[in-house]
Structures are given as C-alpha cells and as structure tokens.
Amino acid sequence: MAAQPQAPSAGGRPRAGKAVKSVARPAKLSRESIVEGALTFLDREGWDSLTINALATQLGTKGPSLYNHVDSLEDLRRAVRIRVIDDIITMLNRVGAGRARDDAVLVMAGAYRSYAHHHPGRYSAFTRMPLGGDDPEYTAATRGAAAPVIAVLSSYGLDGEQAFYAALEFWSALHGFVLLEMTGVMDDIDTDAVFTDMVLRLAAGMERRTTHGGTAST
C-alpha cells in the first residue's frame, strides 16, 4: 500500500487577544487602504461589528471620510468579501501548485483550516457569500473560489458538474469541521488526527466516485 501523504500543520489555533488596539491611520485614505483596514478590523472585532463609523474610529478618522471612497456599508462589505475570496484563491493555488490527488487535497485542506483559525473575521466574511446573485463580478468571484479545488479534482478524473458538486461537498465538510473547532466542541480531541482522517476519506470518496461513474460508493 502506498504511503499516505502527510497533512500540513494547521499552525495551531491562536488564542484570543487581551485587548483590541486601534489600527494605525493610513497616510492617505483610499478604497484599498479602507479595505485593508476592514480586514484587520474583522479579525479583531468580527463581521457583525463592521460598520462605517466603527471602522472609521479604528482608522483614526470620521465616518464621512470613508464615504469619499465607498458608497455604503454594503459596498464596503462587498469589496471585503471579494478581497477575501481573491486571497483564499491565491493561497490555495500557491499551496496546491505542482501537487495532485491526495497530496494536493491534504495540503489545500490544511491551508484552508489554518486560514480560518488565523483570520476568523475574514473567514466569516467568506462563508457568508451567496453562490449566485445579480452582481456579475461578485458571482464570478464566488464561483472562482471553487476553481482551485476543481483543478485538483481533475486529477481524480472528475470534471464539469461532477467536479463542481464534489468541490461543494468537500468545502461543506471542511467548513463544518472548522466551525466545530472554533466553537470549542472538540477541544479534548486530537483534531489534527481527525482532520487528516476526514480529508483522506473525502479523497477516497472522490476516487470511488470516478470508479463508479459519478456516485461515491459507501
């Protein structure tokens, strides 16, 4: 039996900080600097706390100053979501480069898990995105989030709708695991071992899906 590839370390779960510090005020406000400030704000305060006035306070300015660069809170949140999606896509493409099948799946899953724990606010923004909608740019970004995984699934012989559904199933499993970790449900369990086992079982299911014509056997 071939040796199983080793899962990367998730880098551990960071402990909550003692106090929230203000984000340094940008030398000059721009849409990009506001989005950057919002990303830092998210990890410190959380998605539900993100408002124009709260972010402006963290940036050392007033709310009206931000409206010179963003149209509304929803415009800001949309820009943040798209930025987070782009960052995750870049990360998955980087760690998965040159890898295939179980090796790629394990490495990408580990990177996804690590990102969620080290950037909880950004991860929350990512998982609140709809998969469709009336905004072409946003819809394209959300669909693009599955692209790195779909590319890896092609090494199992999956493509088209079959690969897209498999990617959604894979994402659902990772998201569920990460949420359980974040809520502390599995604090007394060797989560690294459980995570590796889960990902390898998912990979085996992809293999069976190809063998059995699109349906993973049980």
Curated annotation (Swiss-Prot):
Residues 28-88 form the HTH tetR-type domain. GO terms for molecular function: DNA-binding transcription factor activity; transcription cis-regulatory region binding. Residues 51-70 bind DNA. Pfam families: TetR_C_33. Residues 1-24 are annotated as: Disordered. GO terms for cellular component: plasma membrane. The keyword Transcription regulation applies. This is Uncharacterized HTH-type transcriptional regulator Rv0681. PROSITE patterns: HTH_TETR_2 (PS50977). It comes from the Bacteria. The modification Phosphothreonine is found at T57. Keywords: DNA-binding, Phosphoprotein, Transcription, Transcription regulation. Phosphorylated on Thr-57 by PknH. One of its GO terms (biological process) is regulation of DNA-templated transcription.
